[in-house]
Curated annotation (Swiss-Prot):
Transmembrane residue ranges: 7-27
Functional summary from the UniProt entry: One of the components of the core complex of photosystem II (PSII). PSII is a light-driven water:plastoquinone oxidoreductase that uses light energy to abstract electrons from H(2)O, generating O(2) and a proton gradient subsequently used for ATP formation. It consists of a core antenna complex that captures photons, and an electron transfer chain that converts photonic excitation into a charge separation. This subunit is found at the monomer-monomer interface.
InterPro entries, alphabetized: PSII_PsbM (IPR007826), PSII_PsbM_sf (IPR037269)
Record key words, sorted: Membrane, Photosynthesis, Photosystem II, Reaction center, Thylakoid, Transmembrane, Transmembrane helix
Protein name per UniProt: Photosystem II reaction center protein M
Subcellular locations according to the entry: Cellular thylakoid membrane
Source organism (scientific name): Synechococcus sp. (strain CC9902)
Amino acid sequence: METNDLGFVASLMFILVPAIFLIVLYIGTNRSEA
């Protein structure tokens, strides 16, 4: 079973980085409004 680790990590980062950015941005706006 051959897996492309680099492609897996790249796709994982492609999903996680925007998700983390949106979560941080969401928490930041909630704290500023509260």
